[in-house]
Amino acid sequence: MGNKIHPIGFRLGITRDWESRWYAGKKQYRHLLLEDQRIRGLLEKELYSAGLARVDIERAADNVAVTVHVAKPGVVIGRGGERIRVLREELAKLTGKNVALNVQEVQNPNLSAPLVAQRVAEQIERRFAVRRAIKQAVQRVMESGAKGAKVIVSGRIGGAEQARTEWAAQGRVPLHTLRANIDYGFALARTTYGVLGVKAYIFLGEVIGGQKPKARPELPKAEERPRRRRPAVRVKKEE
């Protein structure tokens, strides 16, 4: 059996950027990595109703900058900025550092794969028909201007004894093309029969020249280049 590589991890440094941007030594790396996981876990729990699509984390010394990409920024900010102030205090208490929390709105939620997967999972939990939910999701994505979309649901669909997979797709979803800008999202639908997995792939178009060329070492100028002397060749004259 073949397995699909993670479409975002496959394109890191080419068409996608890292969600955690910082450097640490060997001793501190694992602690900061676990800290990032705790930050994301807290935000996913608190901002689920706001439509959380992505969390970016940057570090510099004892300062942490967290940027949340959400569909409903008003839910994060709260009345008079009360909600975001409480979240900032919770993150500072969790990390023990100075935390700057920034909010960025997702312009079109239908073109964000994590939000599409979350919406399908919510519909399944409310006992929507699975085929109808995934077909409507793909149709909304295509109407929003995507080049292609694919939604997959796996598990005990409809309470069946044997797990199966349902999927719907439109357009192109070239997973092996590195210049293809593909967004990927995953969500869980917790039902009375068990947990169903929802995957969403959205093809947003190709990024021409997305890969950054490697910097070539600068050569010294012609005047500065050391000249190599060729060894003199002695030719014997024939007598």
Swiss-Prot record:
GO terms for molecular function: mRNA binding; rRNA binding; structural constituent of ribosome. Residues 39-107 form the KH type-2 domain. GO terms for biological process: translation. PROSITE patterns: KH_TYPE_2 (PS50823), RIBOSOMAL_S3 (PS00548). Gene3D superfamilies: 3.30.300.20, Ribosomal protein S3, C-terminal domain. One of its GO terms (cellular component) is cytosolic small ribosomal subunit. Residues 227-239 have a biased composition (Basic residues). The keyword Ribosomal protein applies. Residues 212-239 are annotated as: Disordered. It holds the Pfam family Ribosomal_S3_C. Keywords: Ribonucleoprotein, Ribosomal protein, RNA-binding, rRNA-binding. Residues 215-226 have a biased composition (Basic and acidic residues). PANTHER family: 30S/40S RIBOSOMAL PROTEIN S3, SMALL RIBOSOMAL SUBUNIT PROTEIN US3C. Binds the lower part of the 30S subunit head. Binds mRNA in the 70S ribosome, positioning it for translation. Belongs to the universal ribosomal protein uS3 family. Part of the 30S ribosomal subunit. Forms a tight complex with proteins S10 and S14. This is Small ribosomal subunit protein uS3. It comes from Thermus thermophilus (strain ATCC 27634 / DSM 579 / HB8). The lineage of its organism: Bacteria, Thermotogati, Deinococcota, Deinococci, Thermales.
